[in-house]
Amino acid sequence: MMWRERAEVRIGISGMPGVGKTTLVLKVAELAAKKLRVCGFVTQEVRERGVRIGFDVVDIASGRRTPLARVGTGEPSVGKYVVFLGACSTISEALRGTCDLLIVDEIGAMEFKCPGFGSDLERAVYNSPKVLAVVHRNYTNLAESLGFEILWLTRDNWSTIYNQVVHRLGLA
């Protein structure tokens, strides 16, 4: 497939919950924004009184924040979270941005509840010269099929992986 040949760099960050995957991606995006056009989206936890109650998706280019999922019952759901399909348009628009570095946080079950996410992701990866994604540990094979090199993040190797990503993206 020709689309696999396009991107110069495709890095996927995976790991267990709470090791700093989103933090790493946000810090790289902040550094990259000094010299590159950055687009895409990040998924951020929403907490209430210290307890995680859900997730919001944030479009990096516009700053638009949209509820993605909350604890509750209903469909579609992922675990204890109900996914709000209204957030799908934010994700889709973020993946259609034109930029030098595409950020995707995350490639995971909630995002795949959005109709068209797979094809939007594939198109965005093809059209972006550099891609940095958070990849849920259950989706690493899929990401590898899109040409991603998967780096496994832990609390112990966070700084090493951060430096490796910065170097690979030409930001050092």
Curated annotation (Swiss-Prot):
> What InterPro entries does UniProt report for this protein, alphabetically?
AAA+_ATPase, Nuc-triphosphatase_THEP1, P-loop_NTPase
Documented EC number(s): 3.6.1.15
**Main enzyme class:** hydrolase
Q: Which residues bind ATP?
A: 15-22, 101-108
Cross-referenced CDD domains: RecA-like_Thep1
Which reaction is the catalytic activity of this chain? a ribonucleoside 5'-triphosphate + H2O = a ribonucleoside 5'-diphosphate + phosphate + H(+)
User: Which key words tag this protein in UniProt?
Assistant: ATP-binding, Hydrolase, Nucleotide-binding
List, in alphabetical order, the Gene Ontology terms for molecular function in this entry.
ATP binding; ATP hydrolysis activity
State the similarity comment.
Belongs to the THEP1 NTPase family.
The record ties this protein, via HAMAP family, to: NTPase_1
- PANTHER family according to UniProt: CANCER-RELATED NUCLEOSIDE-TRIPHOSPHATASE (PTHR43146:SF1)
| Job description of the protein | Has nucleotide phosphatase activity towards ATP, GTP, CTP, TTP and UTP. May hydrolyze nucleoside diphosphates with lower efficiency.
What protein name is recorded for this chain?
A: Nucleoside-triphosphatase THEP1
Source species: Pyrobaculum arsenaticum (strain DSM 13514 / JCM 11321 / PZ6)
